[in-house]
Structure formats: C-alpha cells, structure tokens
C-alpha cells in the first residue's frame, strides 16, 4: 500500500542525552477518498491512490474527465449530490481545483456534508484563507485540512510531497 494512517504514538527516554523520543506506529490501510477536480494533478492523484489499492470516487464539472476515469475503473459521478451520496461516512473529500474556485465549490459542497466529514484543500490556496475556512467549518462539525501538494504530473510515478496543516483529528483520519 502506498498510503499509511497514523495508528498511535508512544514515548520513551532517549538513551543518548536523556531527551524524549516520540515513536510512531504506522499501519497500512485501504481507504476511500473522494476527489473533486480531475485536471492533470487531480486525475493523476486519483490514479496513484487507486493503483495503491484505495477506493477513489471522482467528480469534475467536466463530464469528459469523469468519463475517462470511469473507463479506468473509478466510481465516476456526474453531480456533487451523487458524489457525496456515493462516499461512505465519515467522508474524506480532496478538492484539487484552482484556488480561485475553492470558495464557490465549498458553498455548494458543504451543505451536502455531515458532521465528522473532512474536506482537504490540495490546491494552491493561500493558507490564511484555509485557516478562515477551517474556523468557519469547525462549528458545523466538518474538518478542514490544508494540504499543499507538490509533485506535478510526474507525481503519478514518483509520488507527491504533501505539506499538511489542520487539526490532529482530521489529519489522523
């Protein structure tokens, strides 16, 4: 599997210097993720997830992009309502669209979500906007994670570098 989920931590005294060591246990799991935005980055990220054995539900405003991935075996959806309904709860939804359209997408997406769902902004949004979005969604019980994504279209083969910001609960999922 190519993705791992944090399964727990333990600490003990370092034998050299006496400081505290934080040890993390990792466990490979199969997960389901919804991907909104099937441009070059979003489509390849979905492919990498699926190649790693994960379940990926996809949506894009461009029906041809959805059809192309559906032909590769993805669960393709044609509306946001269908997309959200197809995902198991609690949902993890990765939004991989240009920063200029994230707020507009959230205006439509958030009313369809439930408590404990997670929205991941993987695009190039300014981090202060993502901090504000997280503050807005927290009272609704929706987690928001900012994940700057680097790797470009070559990430399909080489992997991606992810710079993650958000609450521990959401990141731990």
What are these regions (language model features)?
Residues 5-7:
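Short hydrophobic alpha-helical segments enriched in small aliphatic residues
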Residues 24-91, 116, 153-156:
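NAD(P)+-binding Rossmann beta1-loop-alpha1 motif at the extreme N-terminus of oxidoreductases
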Residues 97-99, 124, 149:
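Short glycine-/small-residue-rich Rossmann-like dinucleotide-binding loops
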């Amino acid at each position: 599997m190519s993705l791992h989920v944090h399964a727990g931590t333990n600490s003990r005294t370092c034998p050299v210097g006496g400081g505290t060591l934080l040890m993390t246990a990792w466990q490979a799991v199969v997960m389901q993720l919804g991907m909104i935005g099937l441009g070059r980055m979003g489509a390849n990220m979905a492919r990498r997830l699926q190649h790693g054995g994960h379940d990926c539900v996809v949506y894009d405003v461009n029906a041809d992009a959805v059809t192309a991935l559906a032909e590769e075996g993805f669960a393709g959806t044609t509306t946001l309502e269908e997309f959200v309904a197809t995902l198991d709860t609690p949902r993890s939804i990765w939004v991989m669209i240009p920063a200029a359209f994230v707020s507009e997408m959230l205006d439509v997406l958030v009313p369809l979500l439930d408590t404990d769902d997670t929205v991941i902004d993987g695009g190039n949004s300014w981090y202060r906007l993502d901090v504000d979005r997280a503050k807005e969604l927290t009272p609704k019980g929706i987690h928001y994670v900012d994940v700057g994504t680097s790797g470009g279209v070559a990430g399909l083969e080489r992997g991606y570098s992810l710079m993650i910001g958000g609450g521990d609960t959401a990141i731990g999922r």
